[in-house]
């Protein structure tokens, strides 16, 4: 029976990829046995309740092998993955896109495809489970108690981010993380002996993982036994499973020819004969469906029913905790953060927005028990520390400060995993110039609709002495170009509070907070509530103004000062703070016209970053005071003066406009 089911997985993949004339059959054919063993003997999932929060998680880090996952979901009874959807693999509007997409297809626990990010994201799942278990489980009531399983390939383990995350997972002793390594000695360009020769198991042993070897990737009992041993090891586990890529293909197995191209009609016919598969394309024997129903769907439904009974009893035994758990199960924060939680600020108060961020962050932490995060070894520079808590580790699982180490990319992927798990609000920080290191993870935050908060400090050439390697220029423009990411560059402590409030109440959009090292004065025109519009008027000296200054962040202080100087010279001027171009762009036409009247063409945008995205606001008649070269090393006042970010120069720029 098991051999028939394994071959059903293989041929669903082969047939769908042939029909699409696109895809990666090799991993489907080679990894089918380990995937079958995992689904039928280990995974607790319920196709009728795909979002059950205590389900085991499965991450196909080798996302190019998506038909392996779609075949498993179809056979297990997930309604989203019907046979018609299998036949529509990689087609417009289907539930079976080329790589797995979270939120698009029920049963997909994470978007994967960019190699290395799946295994790294899985680390976040495991850490989320550990925190929630420590927070809410009580004796006899293991409400949060599940494993995170991964299938990865050689390519995943070549990527640096997987090494970052594995080092971190070993240090944290995340013992409910089990990785099955599809070790087939082949990559897209040829054999791995030409590019990847170290002992992976030795490396993972050094990280503090349990490791094991299954020499025959078709030995279901050996795979099952290895997983059982791994679960009892007390460590994260890597099980190397030696497989043959394209198993069963007489002429292509064991070669890179089967990695990323359909088998084609002739080779498919030969493979059917070689594996004894006497069924038509997309024909699955009823006994295969029965096998998956018994060992996946029914087993999962029983586990779900037992868990719901446990939760009901928990509500009786621990009603206060149960109220928070119920919110988490429903996909809500256990406590609502409101604007009233943030203290009022006096005009004239001066503070760096990174410090204002720490104040706001701690307001959130005091209110929301499931709010946690950290920094890539810069907590006391990024100001990301929750003051009431210590560092989280295996011995201190309830602490909410996470020390990610100098692992920016892994930090982002781990945050994604924690957000995907559900039940948590998470954040992570680094210097803004190093947002490049984490950007690929930010992109998956945005693509998956995860409300992760990224805290990026030291936001401009005002860093000064550290010089151009640490002075962001192009970074704001790059992040603003990313769909479904709200970038906030607040002007002062008041706007910073508002940005944090919007970040921790966001449902489907991540947030990047771009913050200063230097002090900024709270302007009398800044407004907590208006930050939600993305842009608003902070200064105006005449109703019939004919000039608009648009600024963000530290340049709002500069723009207001310049506007007051211009006003003293008879100019009629408006200053607009635009903390988020992303949010402002989503406002209706009437609001945009209210803030930036089309009739007023004399406009200057002021920002210490690349100028390119500001012309949409100032037009061809306006000007941009920005930076389109790299920065320089000198004390900050000297750097700012040399780059023209002074009241005198801004006044001159405005005066030069017709």
UniProtKB/Swiss-Prot annotation:
<comment type="subunit">
    <text>Homodimer.</text>
</comment>
<dbReference type="InterPro" id="IPR005478">
    <property type="entry name" value="Transketolase_bac-like"/>
</dbReference>
<comment type="function">
    <text>Necessary for high-efficiency recombination chromosomal DNA during genetic transformation.</text>
</comment>
<keyword id="KW-0233">DNA recombination</keyword>
<feature type="site" description="Important for catalytic activity">
    <location>
        <position position="259"/>
    </location>
</feature>
<dbReference type="Pfam" id="PF02779">
    <property type="entry name" value="Transket_pyr"/>
</dbReference>
<dbReference type="InterPro" id="IPR005475">
    <property type="entry name" value="Transketolase-like_Pyr-bd"/>
</dbReference>
<dbReference type="Pfam" id="PF00456">
    <property type="entry name" value="Transketolase_N"/>
</dbReference>
<protein>
    <recommendedName>
        <fullName>Probable transketolase</fullName>
        <ecNumber>2.2.1.1</ecNumber>
    </recommendedName>
</protein>
<dbReference type="InterPro" id="IPR049557">
    <property type="entry name" value="Transketolase_CS"/>
</dbReference>
<feature type="active site" description="Proton donor">
    <location>
        <position position="408"/>
    </location>
</feature>
<dbReference type="GO" id="GO:0046872">
    <property type="term" value="F:metal ion binding"/>
</dbReference>
<keyword id="KW-0460">Magnesium</keyword>
<keyword id="KW-0808">Transferase</keyword>
<feature type="binding site">
    <location>
        <position position="184"/>
    </location>
    <ligand>
        <name>Mg(2+)</name>
    </ligand>
</feature>
<feature type="binding site">
    <location>
        <position position="154"/>
    </location>
    <ligand>
        <name>Mg(2+)</name>
    </ligand>
</feature>
<feature type="binding site">
    <location>
        <position position="155"/>
    </location>
    <ligand>
        <name>thiamine diphosphate</name>
    </ligand>
</feature>
<dbReference type="GO" id="GO:0006098">
    <property type="term" value="P:pentose-phosphate shunt"/>
</dbReference>
<dbReference type="InterPro" id="IPR005474">
    <property type="entry name" value="Transketolase_N"/>
</dbReference>
<feature type="binding site">
    <location>
        <position position="186"/>
    </location>
    <ligand>
        <name>Mg(2+)</name>
    </ligand>
</feature>
<feature type="site" description="Important for catalytic activity">
    <location>
        <position position="24"/>
    </location>
</feature>
<dbReference type="Pfam" id="PF22613">
    <property type="entry name" value="Transketolase_C_1"/>
</dbReference>
<feature type="binding site">
    <location>
        <position position="259"/>
    </location>
    <ligand>
        <name>thiamine diphosphate</name>
    </ligand>
</feature>
<feature type="binding site">
    <location>
        <position position="466"/>
    </location>
    <ligand>
        <name>substrate</name>
    </ligand>
</feature>
<keyword id="KW-0479">Metal-binding</keyword>
<dbReference type="InterPro" id="IPR009014">
    <property type="entry name" value="Transketo_C/PFOR_II"/>
</dbReference>
<keyword id="KW-0786">Thiamine pyrophosphate</keyword>
<comment type="similarity">
    <text>Belongs to the transketolase family.</text>
</comment>
<feature type="binding site">
    <location>
        <position position="381"/>
    </location>
    <ligand>
        <name>substrate</name>
    </ligand>
</feature>
<dbReference type="InterPro" id="IPR020826">
    <property type="entry name" value="Transketolase_BS"/>
</dbReference>
<feature type="binding site">
    <location>
        <position position="517"/>
    </location>
    <ligand>
        <name>substrate</name>
    </ligand>
</feature>
<dbReference type="InterPro" id="IPR055152">
    <property type="entry name" value="Transketolase-like_C_2"/>
</dbReference>
<keyword id="KW-0106">Calcium</keyword>
<dbReference type="GO" id="GO:0004802">
    <property type="term" value="F:transketolase activity"/>
</dbReference>
<dbReference type="InterPro" id="IPR033247">
    <property type="entry name" value="Transketolase_fam"/>
</dbReference>
<feature type="binding site">
    <location>
        <position position="184"/>
    </location>
    <ligand>
        <name>thiamine diphosphate</name>
    </ligand>
</feature>
<feature type="binding site">
    <location>
        <position position="259"/>
    </location>
    <ligand>
        <name>substrate</name>
    </ligand>
</feature>
<dbReference type="InterPro" id="IPR029061">
    <property type="entry name" value="THDP-binding"/>
</dbReference>
<feature type="binding site">
    <location>
        <position position="458"/>
    </location>
    <ligand>
        <name>substrate</name>
    </ligand>
</feature>
<comment type="function">
    <text>Catalyzes the transfer of a two-carbon ketol group from a ketose donor to an aldose acceptor, via a covalent intermediate with the cofactor thiamine pyrophosphate.</text>
</comment>
<feature type="binding site">
    <location>
        <position position="434"/>
    </location>
    <ligand>
        <name>thiamine diphosphate</name>
    </ligand>
</feature>
<feature type="binding site">
    <location>
        <begin position="113"/>
        <end position="115"/>
    </location>
    <ligand>
        <name>thiamine diphosphate</name>
    </ligand>
</feature>
